[in-house]
Design a protein with these regions (language model features):
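Active-site loop/oxyanion-hole signature of alpha/beta-hydrolase fold enzymes
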Residues: 54-97
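Acidic catalytic loop of the alpha/beta-hydrolase fold
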Residues: 225-229
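Short beta-strand/loop motif that positions the catalytic acidic residue
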Residues: 214, 220-222
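Flexible "cap/lid" loop of the alpha/beta hydrolase fold
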Residues: 117-148
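Alpha/beta-hydrolase fold catalytic core
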Residues: 1-28, 49-50, 91-93, 266-280
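Conserved HGGG/HGGXW glycine-rich cap/lid loop of the alpha/beta-hydrolase fold
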Residues: 20-64
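Conserved alpha/beta-hydrolase catalytic His-Asp/Glu region
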Residues: 130, 152-212
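Catalytic histidine-centered segment of alpha/beta-hydrolase-like enzymes
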Residues: 252-261
Length: 280
C-alpha cells in the first residue's frame, strides 16, 4: 500500500495537520468528529489505494488552537474552513468519508454537489428533523455549566463518557482512550463549546435542507447501539440521499469500524468502484 505522509499546511493563518496518501485520480477526504482527530482514519488510510487526505480540524488533534476571538468554531465556520483546506490542497472533485461532526462538510457538498464523487456517512451528526442532543452535548450547550464541566475532565472521566457510545457501556480499548486524551486540552474544550452552541436543532435541520442535491453514490453505515445518535437516523439519512445504500450494524456503536472492523474494507471497496450505485 502507498505510504501515509504527514505534514502541516497554513490555512487562513492556522497551522493544520494532515495525513495524505498519494495516488492517481480524485482523492477521498476523511473528516473526523468530536473528540477525536485524523488518527481515527488510520485503518482506512492503511488500506486505501489512494489518493486520500485526512486532517485535524482547528482546535482538535495536532492542528493549532486559535483563540475563539480570532477563529469561527461554529458549524458553518468549520465548514468554510474545510472548503479552504481543500482549496489550499488543490482538491476539486473528491469523495467524502465523514463521521460524527464530520457531517458539517455536507453543508458545502450541498452547495457544490457536482464535486462529490462518492459519499460515506458513518454515524454522522444529524442534519435532519427530529434529533435531540445527547446528554453530554446538552451540558456543553448550556452556558456556565459547559465551562464548569470542562474543568472536570480527566482520562477516567473521558473513559466513562466514551462508554456511552456503546449500547452495552463496555470500555473502549485503552489505546483508543489514549489517542483521544493525548490531544485534548483547553483549546479543544473551547472549540467544543462553540461548535455545539452553534447548532440548535433548527440550525441542524437548515444545514441539511438540500441533501437531495447530493446525487453521488452514498453509503450510509450505522452502528445501531450508538447512544449519542439514535439508530433511526441512519435510515433517515439514506432516505434523503437519492442514490444511497444503508448498512445497519446491530452490534456496533458510535465508531462502527472499531466495533465491526470489516467496515473498513467495505468502505474501501465502495470508494474504489466506479459503478453508479453502491455494491453489496
Amino acid at each position: 500500500m502507498p505510504p501515509i505522509e504527514t505534514g502541516t499546511v497554513m490555512v487562513d493563518g492556522v497551522s493544520t495537520f494532515f495525513r495524505r496518501v498519494h495516488g492517481d485520480g480524485p482523492p477521498t477526504l476523511f473528516v473526523h468528529g468530536n473528540p477525536t482527530h485524523s488518527e481515527d482514519w488510520q485503518p482506512f488510510l492503511e488500506r486505501i489505494q489512494g489518493p486520500a487526505l485526512a486532517f485535524d480540524l482547528p482546535g482538535w488533534g495536532r492542528s493549532a488552537r486559535p483563540s475563539p476571538a480570532e477563529f469561527d468554531y461554529s458549524m458553518d465556520g468549520l465548514a468554510r474552513f474545510t472548503g479552504r483546506f481543500l482549496q489550499r490542497m488543490a482538491v476539486e472533485e473528491h469523495s467524502l468519508v465523514v463521521h460524527d461532526w464530520g457531517a458539517l462538510v455536507l453543508i458545502g457538498a450541498q452547495e457544490e454537489p457536482e464535486r462529490i464523487r462518492r459519499l460515506v456517512l458513518l454515524n454522522a451528526v444529524v442534519l435532519l428533523p427530529g434529533y435531540r442532543w445527547h446528554r453530554t452535548a446538552r451540558v456543553w450547550r448550556t452556558r456556565r455549566l459547559g465551562e464548569l464541566s470542562n474543568r472536570l475532565w480527566t482520562r477516567r472521566v473521558l473513559d466513562l463518557g466514551l462508554r456511552e457510545s456503546r449500547g452495552d457501556w463496555s470500555r473502549h480499548d485503552p489505546a483508543f482512550i489514549d489517542m483521544v486524551w493525548d490531544h485534548l486540552d483547553g483549546g479543544t474544550f473551547d472549540a467544543i463549546l462553540r461548535l455545539y452552541r452553534s447548532a440548535p436543532p433548527d440550525r441542524l435541520v437548515a444545514a441539511g435542507a438540500h441533501l437531495e442535491r447530493i446525487t453521488a453514490p452514498a453509503l450510509v453505515v450505522w452502528g445501531m447501539r450508538d447512544r449519542y445518535i439514535p439508530a433511526r437516523f441512519g435510515a433517515a439519512y439514506a432516505a434523503r440521499l437519492p442514490n444511497s445504500e444503508l448498512v445497519e450494524l446491530a452490534n456496533a456503536g458510535h465508531w462502527p469500524w472499531i466495533d465491526a472492523p470489516e467496515v473498513v474494507d467495505r468502505v474501501i471497496r465502495f470508494l474504489a468502484t466506479d459503478e453508479d450505485f453502491p455494491t453489496p
